[in-house]
Amino acid sequence: MSDINDISSYDYFLPEMLIAKEPVLPKEEARLLVYLKKTKEIKHYKFKDLASLIPDDAAVIFNNTKVIKARILGHKQSGGACEVMLNQPLGDNKFSVYVRGRVSVGSVLNFADDIKVNVLELNDDGSRVVNFTKNGVILDTAQLFSELEKIGHVPLPPYIKRADTKDDESWYQSIFAKNSGAVAAPTASLHFSEQMLERIKAKHDIAYITLHVGAGTFKGVECQNINDHKMHSEFYELSEKAQEIISSNKPILGVGTTVTRCVEEFARSKQSSGFCKLFLNLNNKPIRQNYLLTNFHLPKSTLIMLVTSFIGLEETMRIYETAVSEKYRFYSYGDGMLVI
């Protein structure tokens, strides 16, 4: 029997060919693996079947965060190329970023439209604290997001090894994206078409939360013992409707791991907004959410550990082995799974 605290227990083999480089179109034709908790059965559907699979009494909660063009390409003062990936605002017009290439405190990085990045601090997790200026004037968050729309690139995950295209601007954004701030998509949301959403609204209570997905979502767990992992922090905010649903006895389907973490954060803290650092795993199981819709996640990631918190390690790995053998498409642009 596998040790639930050992990182190697969350590893699995994935052929490179199963990593989706672009989505299935139309969206609802993506495949959907369904796991029935009571019987431990695995069934195979498509996303267009989702509305008929959700338990009748369940409320459905979505994440309406909007992905920004968080990746910018420029040059160091020395002339060498550099790449900056925005992580999140820190307040006081400072931002957490990841920089590809070596930079030190005091470095100034140059980008299009006279945008400059000034490196102020180096963090232990590899991120940098910076501010952004245009024509010498420090940019606030709204101004920065506006400038990034002009010069930035869609922040495709590192395992999608190609340049972003115009298509990614719509592919990597959910149809209900509203509040700008994510630097990665809440990928379970990407499967929804307007028609699918209307079918669900006709049968279920729905609500929205906002959790701005940070670049830390791609950061692997590097500790041998998962309990030593330091979880990244992400800003969240719940609508009044979401708070009402979580505070009720109504069963909840969370669309994606970001919704799950937000639901569980509120169930514990009763704080309607703040920063979520919740690490759900077999030592810290959900206390409120009942059902989960999610994509297939990277080996040894906090996201696959979140899945185990619902159904256990052995069943999770059995599902993943089945998905590989059935040639499901993995990761952000891939297929999904429903735990009910």
From Swiss-Prot:
UniProt-recorded Gene Ontology molecular function terms: S-adenosylmethionine:tRNA ribosyltransferase-isomerase activity
Keywords: Cytoplasm, Queuosine biosynthesis, S-adenosyl-L-methionine, Transferase
Chief localization: cytoplasm
Known EC number: 2.4.99.17
Entry-linked Gene3D superfamilies: QueA-like
SUPFAM superfamilies, per the entry: QueA-like
A GO biological process held by the record: queuosine biosynthetic process
Family to which this protein belongs: Belongs to the QueA family.
Subunit record text: Monomer.
Protein name listed in UniProt: S-adenosylmethionine:tRNA ribosyltransferase-isomerase
Organism: Campylobacter concisus (strain 13826)
Name of the coding gene: queA
